[in-house]
Amino acid sequence: MKSHAFDYQRPRDVEESLRFLSNENSKPLAGGQSLGPMLNLRIVQPALLVDLRHIEELKAATETKDSVTFGACVTHAAIEDGRVPDPTRGFMREIAANIAYRAVRNRGTIGGSLAHADPAADWPSALSVLGATVLIAGPGGRREVLIDKFLTGLFETALKADEILVAIRVPKLSARARVGYWKFCRKAGEFAQAIGAALDDPDRGFARAVIGATRGAPHLLADAAALFAKPEKQALLRAVDGAGLAADAYNRQLHAVALRRAIEKLAA
């Protein structure tokens, strides 16, 4: 199928993009790796497409002593290749390198993936376990939202209709931090059936775990220290049940194993 006809605008900066997006039935375009197929299948039919890919602010990554801020249009490939700073000592590069295929990574963006909020995508779970902060711009100015408040459900976020995601700020891991991630896919490059992520950062007081690829937003275990110390089957299953996955025995077991393997990688 082909998309229905729409108007197209290429704004020069964030403020101009917000003016265009104030039009009724407009849609922002970042990498287009999710939006493109949705347009072709006519799942979405915007009257106006606003292309954000040429806004310099959204393509930049800035580093401070404590964090790295990634513009929304930083591509997966830029992270994979090390063309932008990695605050996680290689973890984000590994995540990016295992997203879909290189052609997708060349165009797909970290901000587009997060704003799309597909539970089976990698960045929602990975950024949740890292404790990222989402930077948002709208007609009323700019605001910041913690990622666990930003991701609200299945393809749902805290973004208002007239706002855009402009950046993601990721705190730097301390020297003693350990992070683990595991996903199950039917075949390489596909969206995940189950995701487990774990972060143990004692210098910052973090012992977090995330159960991803659920029926909604990633399920955050904000204090997972006891689970890290003793990741027994029943404790893992209870955690998975808390993510609303108790009804399907296969899915429940798959998520429990993904979480266990992510925790095991902390000691690797």
Where do the language-model regions lie?
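C-terminal structural segment of proteins
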Residues: 1-268
